[in-house]
Amino acid sequence: MRKLKLVMVGNGMAGVRTLEELRKIAPDMYDITVFGAEPHPNYNRILLSPVLAGEMTIQDIILNDLQWYADNGITLHLGARVTEIDRRNRSVIATDRNGQTITVDYDRLLIATGSTPFMPPFPGRDLPGVISYRDIKDTDEMIDAAARYRHAVVIGAGLLGLEAANGLALRGMAVTVVHNSEWIMERQLDRTAGKMLQAELEKKGMQFKMNAQTAELVAGESGRVAAVKFKDGDSIPADLVCVAAGIRPNVELAEKAGIHCNRGIVVNDTLQSYDPRVYAVGECANHRGTAYGLVAPLFEQAKVCANHLAEMGIGRYQGSVTSTKLKVTG
């Protein structure tokens, strides 16, 4: 009996968890091909903050090493950028790290492209020394900058921004957190709790500039970012600017393929898109109007999606109740 062909675009936690669940219940049903844009196997993105803080190494946060893919008969293309999903011919077209074109046919397609950091459109956002905080490459850049420079500015005081600020402070940088609200983590905390947390973080050496709107990032003589200028005319020095201003579902490929998207790839309770051969899980998916950015919902999606791919599709994803944890204070 011919195995079905399953192609997965994306090599992150939600997608690989789906493959793990699928292998448990239908180990021989699919020939699986995975495309990952990063040069690393699947790792725990949540633990990038301890890596930045010097508490863990990159190797410590690898969830599925290269041997796992080989042991499970999965064809893995790392550093490969998928350029097109051809739904008419049911194929995925990608460019590998050597610039060669790869075309792989599918019977089922799983899109797990995650999200991309939102970079506000202020002038200077493309300067050297201006980064987001999303992956191993970003973390390595911040670790390198902390060893060479003094002043860091983190734009955004949500969970990710505060964890970045904490890691940079632990590595010896003078860190200023810039936020356009009255208190930090305003989506999770009320004013009193936000002010209390800010006071604790100030004891750790962080500075805060609240109700601030960035006007531009200014270059120094070397061409690298040197300062952050605000709309009130104030400015502060910055050898490194980490922008943590939120994320956006990565749906460009799906939209280009004509798959219905609305703040994410719209999926039903079995994680299928409007094309029933195409599934989506993780931060790129929008289920009942919500795109989840936390691990627990993504793993719940993975289990339902795997059951349906295995044609044991009685399970339904009903949505998730979420909570968050800030990893900076203890």
Per-range role (PLM):
Residues 1-5, 24, 284-330:
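Mid-to-C-terminal Rossmann-like scaffold of FAD/NAD(P)H-dependent oxidoreductases
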Residues 2-75, 167-188:
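Beta1-alpha1 glycine-rich phosphate/pyrophosphate-binding loop at the start
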Residues 9, 104-114, 155, 236-246, ...:
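Short hydrophobic core segments
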Residues 13-16, 39, 115-117, 137, ...:
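Residue-level detector of alpha-helix initiation sites
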Residues 126-149, 220-229, 233-307:
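FAD-site-proximal beta/loop scaffold in flavoenzymes
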